[in-house]
Amino acid sequence: MTEIVDIIAREILDSRGNPTVEVDVVLEDGAFGRAAVPSGASTGAHEAVEKRDGDKSRYGGKGVKSAVDAVNGELFDALSGVDAEDQRRIDNLMIALDGTPNKSRLGANAILGVSLAVAKAAAESAGLPLYKYVGGVSARVLPVPMMNIINGGAHADNPIDIQEFMILPTGSPTFAEALRMGAEIFHGLKKALKDAGHNTNVGDEGGFAPNLGSAEDALAFIVKAGEAAGYKSGEDFVLGLDVAATEFFKNGKYELEGEGKSLDPAQMVDYLAGLADKFPILSIEDGMSEDDFDGWKLLTDKLGKKVQLVGDDLFVTNPKRLQIGLDKGLANSILIKVNQIGTLSETIDAVDMAHRAAYTSVMSHRSGETEDSTIADLAVALNCGQIKTGSLARSDRLAKYNQLLRIEEALDDQAVYAGRAVLKGR
């Protein structure tokens, strides 16, 4: 009854107006699953490859018709009649059919769309919400939202080098209250920026993109806005950064052009440590470039006991890259982006591997998103305890937050908000 009878892919648009892949899967019993695939702006060199057409006469070369054709052709032929409840078999069949180490032949966007839609169809067939189907009875921890409320770097057209400045409402008793705190601080920040004469346009992920002079300026505005909203920084909420350092690592130096700084790896570590001393920063993502292992080691040795150091470009949700980090003692947390690795099974493996090594995990969106809220369910299913899904603006971001509100409501008194404990004593 749970055999796959139809797979239909189409080209849709993401939140930046670029094409992406959406996949529908239908099972013999009539169960249906739909998934839309996200896309990143700053991408790691070691990520699985999303397939784009390259035809400049359509969408500037960013069309995904070839990936859609791969789903409707080869992948449908290979998976027709296969039991949707055997997720790992399905994912392995697609990986084998692709035949490349980075899913570049069929496209990670084609493979992931099918992988997630299959899981959703199987969940519907089982009469379970996706988070329970994937995570079982232990899926009850609501994640701390890491809310990106000031954007810089590749996500905004301003002189700030660091890509994301986030608030983590760790002091709330529930996810719903955490979301309220985030929204109140977000609106307070808008007022503070406006009062200071800054623009309040938003970047790709819904955060503000003001023309501030430095990272310190951005952090000071956020702390001020939080305290004006009645919340205490360092207690009710803490701060997080996504440095996206790979984006400005050139010829062995970290080129902070907005601040007029050119730093070697040791100086970059000192720069980040200085920010963490001055502000309640408890999470730093991609503080060093993806292949600057020596720099990562310096950063981990200096800050790893008091700050969560998240590897995004460093690990690209890939167990092989994570193993390098574990062997070398790099970072202490992994960012989980389903489209970096390209299947649900491999995503689960990456989270399991991280948790076994006492690393934390953060479920994450991409800057090019859709209304699909799968990652909200996966954050709960995999007990990540943290989720990065943008700001408190743009419906593509709010879709995930609103789904988490529904999950918390459905879990009722079984729901647990991860809170400060998820940062492991930091």
Swiss-Prot record:
Main subcellular location: cytoplasm
Family affiliation: Belongs to the enolase family.
Biochemical pathway: Carbohydrate degradation; glycolysis; pyruvate from D-glyceraldehyde 3-phosphate: step 4/5
Keyword Translocase found: no
Source organism: Caulobacter sp. (strain K31)
Sites where the protein binds (2R)-2-phosphoglycerate: 163, 337, 366-367, 388
Organism ancestry: Bacteria, Pseudomonadati, Pseudomonadota, Alphaproteobacteria, Caulobacterales
UniProt signal peptide: none
Ranges annotated as biased composition (Basic and acidic residues): 47-58
Gene coding for it: eno
Protein name: Enolase
Residues holding Mg(2+): 242, 285, 312
